[in-house]
Amino acid sequence: MSNERPYRLTLLGVAYRSAYEGQAPIELERLARTARRAGCVLPYTVAEGARLTVDVLPALYALADGAEELTAEERAGRALDFHVTMAAAVAEVLGILSVRTGLRTVALAGGVFQNALLLEELLPRIGDHHVLLPHRIPPNDGGIAYGQVAVALARMRCS
């Protein structure tokens, strides 16, 4: 057994241990909403090929740089920067895919889009697209379960 201390991973002091699913992103969004400055886009890259690859590691390094010494206000600003950066990256990928496919409609689904701040930052960046958002069915695993039930019912009716 090693005497080494376990590596602790946390982003800006948020949710070292999560008590429930989604706790860390909820806390990060809450922290970002207390920022007293505009957010800025941190460095990231999108590599084009058969697949698009988004590398946000440079942004994570920027967020972590000197994080131990940050004031609460500075942590809030960096949390906002994270959201702005993720929105910029999603918008860039959407733009590339739109050019490749000619599609102008996008469905924003999945638990990540329960983050209202991410949506607020993303929607203005993709304003020329027709955006579909879930309203009656949750965008997270509950929506997936609903879809699975719908498929099962359809298959039962066809058999």
Which sequence ranges carry the predicted segments?
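Acidic, glycine/GT-rich loop-and beta-edge segments that sit at the periphery of enzyme/chaperone cores
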Residues: 149-159
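A contiguous, well-structured pocket-lining segment that forms one wall/lid of small-molecule binding clefts
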Residues: 1-103, 117-123
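Glycine- and other small-residue-rich loops at beta-strand/loop junctions that grip anionic moieties
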Residues: 79, 83, 111, 135
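Glycine-rich beta-strand-to-loop/alpha-helix junction loops that act as flexible
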Residues: 106-115
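Residues that form or flank phosphate/diphosphate-binding pockets in enzymes
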Residues: 116-117, 141
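Short, glycine-/Ser/Thr-/acidic-enriched flexible segments
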Residues: 17, 113-114, 136-138, 151
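Conserved phosphate-binding/catalytic loops in two-lobed NTP-binding clefts
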Residues: 105-106, 122-145
